[in-house]
Amino acid sequence: MSEYLTKGPVLINFWATWCSPCKKEMVFLDKFERQYKDNGLSILSISIDSQKSLSHVRSYIRANDYIYDIFLDPNRQVFKKLNGNLMPTNVLIDTDGKVIWRHYGYIPGVEKNMDIQLRSALKLNA
């Protein structure tokens, strides 16, 4: 994680292949990664799918050509450590390692608030 934080803020997204709202949100996460990566944003997408579902995770990511980094947390250790409770869960961490924003679940339109939070963390004009 520290290697990402040296570049800028990090948005950690917890998702699963069985979570339809997660998949809807991933489209916006990819857009944000493409839009803000040159400003220092890193998006780490962490699947809580089981080890048995690893092939589903890989094929889903390949099929959608997402550019952000994908990790696995099949035992949900990181998910629990960051107080995840609903899917999807998003946690925005500043360069000091402090959680500055957290969002649980997905509803259409949440991407606008997410964009505001990302721009603020990146110190970009609103």
Model segments located where?
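A short beta-strand-turn-helix
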Residues: M1-V10
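Aromatic-flanked redox-active Cys/Sec active sites in thiol-based oxidoreductases
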Residues: N13-W18
